[in-house]
Amino acid sequence: MASTGLPQLPPSQKAVIQSEKTPGAFEVSENRPVPVPKANELIVKVSAVSLNHCDWKMPGRVPCPGAVDGADYSGTIVRMGEIAALKSGFQIGDRVAGAQMASSRRRPWAGAFTEYLRDEYDMVWKVPDNLSWEQAAAIGCATTSTVGMALWISMKLPGTPENPIKEPKLVLVYGGSTASGTFAIQLLKLSGYKVVTTCSPKNFKLVEEYGADKAFDYHSATCGEDIRAYTNNTLEYALDIITEARTIRHCYAAIGRGGGRYCGFELLPEDLIATMRKSVKAEWVMGLEMTGLEIDLPGGYYRKANPELHTWFCDWKERYVALFGSGKTKTHPITVRQGGLEKVIDGIESMRRREVSGEKIVYPLYIKGC
């Protein structure tokens, strides 16, 4: 890697890591090494990070003491490996965004909550000029890739934003006021679908602004039955962002008598699914699969390497970047919190306590004016 004439990088950096002493807890390390890129990698100086539920869920389920945490980020390319420099189309100084495969036993260095990170060049995307650091970090890759996988790989929906269906069909997005939910709603509307969704009544206006045709209160014990009545027993597709026993039951209750497809964002409880209608095909997706790498996680999360899915992601990435760049889709509502990496842990704990609703928490790491 040639670095002649480039500013020297510091030898060490700060990072939010999984606690060495307390499983599921986090701490700020002051002396993590600044990475050196492999041939197909970039080094990115991180400008902003956003929070996802996986930032606290996965470390709790699969503790990796000392591993860097965090998925979504935006930042500036400061170094490039030889292959990345030749093939990526990027240049030093480009604004990029992406998602890290954090909390990995094989890749403990991988994580967004740090000052400098390394990433494969085909896992990042160039940030359009109309997006700020904070907006780009809020998009990241985790949400966009998982939603895309759910709609077109798992649920096999006909129609895309580029080629919408001509006769609208109904799709349920359970958890519409989440970042994944508002993105899914927008994609479905662009693809020609009618969208029913669930959220708290305080967020009805929010999901309607993003395109939902009808919102239902997920607190209601008859939520699923109410959706089934509203859709005249014809609903075929349910995307469950939340994926808990209660939400699975609601989604199955909403799907019409003819059956259909259900897709969750979490490992499905086999004992529960075994008791549900066989006319509904149930699957779940995991955004980490977009890397194409083996996902070496226990407890049902293991995945074989899937290079075909990575190829799909590389195409999908260019498509959703174009949607945001053209203004056809917009980011989830953002709440910017100051304090840098030292305060990221507070945000993670807020999410763990379920205090975040209808907003995406973003922490800028850059100095204004620089």
Curated annotation (Swiss-Prot):
Superkingdom of this protein's organism: Eukaryota
Keywords assigned by UniProt, alphabetized: NADP, Nucleotide-binding, Oxidoreductase
A GO molecular-function annotation: oxidoreductase activity, acting on NAD(P)H
Enzyme class: oxidoreductase
UniProt-listed InterPro entries: ADH-like_C (IPR013149), ADH-like_N (IPR013154), GroES-like_sf (IPR011032), NAD(P)-bd_dom_sf (IPR036291), PKS_ER (IPR020843), Trans-enoyl_RdTase-like (IPR047122)
UniProt xrefs under Pfam families: ADH_N, ADH_zinc_N
Record has DNA repair as a keyword: no
Region feature Disordered, mapped onto this chain: 1-32
Mutant phenotype after disruption: Abolishes the production of xenoacremones A, B and C.
Oxidoreductase as UniProt keyword: yes
Residues that hold NADP(+) according to the record: 54-57, 177-180, 200-203, 218, 265-266, 356-357
Entry's EC annotation: 1.-.-.-
Pathway the protein acts in: Mycotoxin biosynthesis
Recorded family membership: Belongs to the zinc-containing alcohol dehydrogenase family.
Subunit (UniProt): Monomer.
Main function: Trans-enoyl reductase; part of the gene cluster that mediates the biosynthesis of xenoacremones such as xenoacremone A, a compound that shows inhibitory activity toward the PI3K/AKT signaling pathway and which has the ability to induce apoptosis of A549 lung cancer cells. Within the pathway, cooperation of the hybrid PKS-NRPS xenE and the trans-acting enoyl reductase xenG is responsible for the formation of the reduced tyrosine-nonaketide derivative. The alpha/beta hydrolase xenA then accelerates intramolecular nucleophilic attack to give a pyrrolidone derivative.
The protein's name in its UniProt record: Trans-enoyl reductase xenG
Source organism per UniProt: Xenoacremonium sinensis (Endophyte fungus)
